[in-house]
Amino acid sequence: MSATGDRHPTQGDQEAPVSQEGAQAEAAGAGNQEGGDSGPDSSDMVPAAEVVGVAGPVEGLGEEEGEQAAGLAAVPQGGSAEEDSDIGPATEEEEEEEEGNEAANFDLAVATRRYPAAGIGFVFLYLVHSLLRRLYHNDHIQIANRHLSRLMVGPHAAVPNLWDNPPLLLLSQRLGAGAAAPEGEGLGLIQEAASVQEAASVPEPAVPADLAEMAREPAEEAADEKPPEEAAEEKLTEEATEEPAAEEPTSEEAVAPEEVTKSQPEKWDEEAQDAAGEEEKEQEKEKDVENKVKNSKGT
């Protein structure tokens, strides 16, 4: 390789105008030497020194232009490198973010595919909780005891019985409205009236009208249940009454049952009178004893 080939192209550009201008100046100087004495126009010719002096600034301008061209050529290369260095990391970060987003979306998609009913359990539990809460706070579902429910029921207003006389009214109305109807329809109306009467004859359940009656029922039940002592006394009295009845003659045993039922109250009255007389006698005896004691103390 030659030495000229290794040189930078910008340096060749800078030296090219200088060599051309030097050649022109030498040619002009040679012309002046040849024709300096020949004609009157020799004074108008520019000396070689002046041409060289002019060529100096021209060479300086050429060097400056070459440096500017080299700078302009170098600046795009450096700027492009810096821009590439700045753009490179930004693009890499964006690509990483996109890859991360894609991975997250893929995970979500996989989760939804693997567990499609993940949120149904929470919804079902919330629904069951709300239903149980409503059932717990609903007063119409509470079950009370029998006696409490009977006491809590208030007096019912007397409901008018619409089934007292509607069959006759229906018969009169229907027969009056269907006077022009054929005989077969009249028989059907009579059968319907009979069925309505049978439905009306069904007894209705008795409903207590007052709370007082409802409260008396437990008291009556308690009164019916007598204590064992009273039951034993009643048995003794019955046995005592049965013994004299057994000692009576057989003629009285043949008495009709009506007479026996009539004589039993009389016997009970006599026994009560005897018991009262005995009590009075005992009281009189006690009074006599007290009087005797007082008299003895007074003496």
From Swiss-Prot:
Compositional bias of kind Basic and acidic residues: 1-10, 215-238, 282-293
Pfam annotation, one family: CT47
Acidic residues bias spans: 81-101, 239-251, 268-281
Keywords attached to this entry: Coiled coil
Coiled-coil annotated residue ranges, if any: 270-298
PANTHER family with a match to the protein in the record: CANCER_TESTIS ANTIGEN FAMILY 47 MEMBER B1, GENE 6268-RELATED
Name of this protein: Cancer/testis antigen family 47 member B1
Natural source organism: Homo sapiens (Human)
Lineage: Eukaryota, Metazoa, Chordata, Craniata, Vertebrata
